[in-house]
Design a protein with these regions (language model features):
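Glycine-rich phosphate/pyrophosphate-binding loop and the adjoining helix
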Residues: 134-135, 140-192, 199, 344-347, ...
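Glycine-rich phosphate/diphosphate-binding loop of Rossmann-like nucleotide-binding domains
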Residues: 6-25, 154-248
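N-terminal glycine-rich phosphate/adenylate-binding segment common to multiple enzyme folds
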Residues: 47-159, 163-164, 271, 275
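Glycine-rich phosphate/nucleotide-binding loop
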Residues: 257-356, 363-367
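N-terminal small/polar loop signature for handling phosphorylated ligands or for N-terminal nucleophile
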Residues: 46-60, 223-264
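N-terminal alpha-helical transmembrane segments of multi-pass membrane transport
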Residues: 2-8, 18-23, 27-53, 61-64
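Flexible, glycine/charged-enriched surface loops at secondary-structure junctions
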Residues: 36-41, 202-210, 234-247, 342-354, ...
Length: 403
């Protein structure tokens, strides 16, 4: 069988630990036998980021802007323990944070539903998509540890050199910590438009929530920009489509989501989306059953898994032990990127391949072949727990029948 041809390369961002192992397995077992795979490769593994002073992350984001579609493996965001483990020059920032800031996009995360795995919340019968603002807030922060006797102020200098000062806290008798965060009106507006456009495309209601009663300038600015754009540009379109935009406070939103009937888009600020996407994914069954795509205002797409590097399984792998690691989210990152590349380049065969690979993956699970995390959740009677590679081989068997 002739391999499916590609016109334009995908930007391929390799990653860390167990997901890096899975990344290669997916390519070897499910992609390269069928596709003449064209990628522009960037190694975002922590060791290489350290070697390049994180320049490789910047280069990969610029390549994504150039080519339009990227697929990214999960990566380590270093903490103090990782500094020691990898002998790092410095505590490098999150690659995702860097890429999202450079692309200024919105992250849409949607659970993958399969028969036999019932959400922990029985009323959730349809997917809840989390739309996460991908710029700013604590992910582009500046922070300091301060010593007793210090005074922390927020200072803004305008274009004429005039300073506006606000006292944050007087640390006269104690040590402490401070943090500065920011966002841009333009980025918030892009986020709002991306959410409203996605809601129209999917024909789903959209919710948005902040804490504007406490954060009367910062969070309230998000609320105001969303409302202004909705009223001026989207209200009539939403009414014609029979969908609605709903704003509430973030704590009220959490309560409403838990008791809801699902099936809508929940727009969240950056940190809220980071946290709530994990909560929603886990409530549906597994964080490894969640698609994630970053969409920029100028139509650039970056697909990734919505979970981490699976450190515990990686250490088992290094000892030569078999792991049963769920590869579905990483697999769907590849299918999402290949499908989008096919759509952009007019390659029907590539689109069909991505569709078939997703069908084969879901079919494998629904026929009872799955990794340990799903086996613990599945209500299917004749289920079989398999290891990481065995699952991908089982998917390949079904893919061959669909091709």
């Amino acid at each position: 069988m002739a391999k499916i041809q590609m016109k334009t390369p995908l930007v391929e961002m390799d990653g860390d630990e167990m997901t890096r192992i899975i990344w290669k397995m997916i390519k070897d077992i499910l992609l390269t036998p069928y596709i003449d795979l064209k990628t522009e490769y960037y190694d975002l593994g922590l060791e290489h980021r350290n070697e390049t002073n994180d320049q490789v992350t910047v280069d990969s984001a610029n390549a994504t802007k150039k080519y339009g579609v990227a697929v990214k493996c999960a990566t380590i965001t270093p903490n103090a323990a990782r500094m020691t483990e990898y002998n790092l020059k410095e505590m490098w920032k999150s690659p995702n944070g860097t890429i999202r800031a450079m692309l200024d996009g919105t992250v849409f995360r949607t659970p993958i539903l399969v028969k036999g795995i019932t959400p922990y919340i029985p009323t959730w019968t349809k997917p809840i998509t989390i739309a996460r603002h991908a710029y700013g807030d604590i992910y582009k922060n500046v922070e300091m540890q301060v010593k007793a006797g210090s005074k922390a102020e927020l200072v803004c200098t305008d274009k004429d050199g005039k300073e506006t000062r606000e006292l944050i806290y007087d640390f006269s008798n104690e040590d402490g910590i401070i943090q500065g965060v920011h966002n841009r009106d333009e980025s918030i507006a892009s986020f709002a438009k991306a959410c409203f456009n996605y809601a129209l495309d999917m024909k789903k209601d959209i919710w948005f929530a902040t804490k504007d009663t406490i954060s009367k300038k910062y969070d309230h600015r998000f609320k105001d920009i969303f409302q202004e754009i909705y009223d001026n540009e989207y209200k009539e379109k939403f009414e014609a489509a029979g969908i609605e935009y709903f704003y509430t406070l973030i704590d009220d939103a959490v309560a409403r989501v838990i008791r809801s009937n699902s099936g809508y888009i929940w727009a969240c600020k950056n940190y809220d989306g980071d946290v709530m996407s994990d909560m929603v994914a886990t409530a549906y069954g597994s964080l490894a059953m969640m698609t994630s795509v970053l969409v920029s205002p100028d139509g650039v797409y970056e697909y990734e898994a919505a979970h981490g590097t699976v450190q515990r399984h990686y250490y088992k792998h290094l000892k030569g032990e078999k792991t049963s690691t769920n590869s579905v989210a990483t697999l769907f990152a590849w299918t999402g990127a290949l499908r989008k590349r096919g759509e952009m380049d007019g390659l029907d065969d590539l689109i069909k391949f991505a569709d078939n690979l997703e069908k084969a993956t879901i079919q494998t699970i629904e026929e009872g072949v799955m990794t340990g995390d799903l086996a613990a959740l599945s209500t299917l009677e004749n289920k079989q727990k398999v290891d990481t590679e065995e699952f991908l081989l089982a998917v390949n068997e079904r893919l061959q029948k669909l091709m």
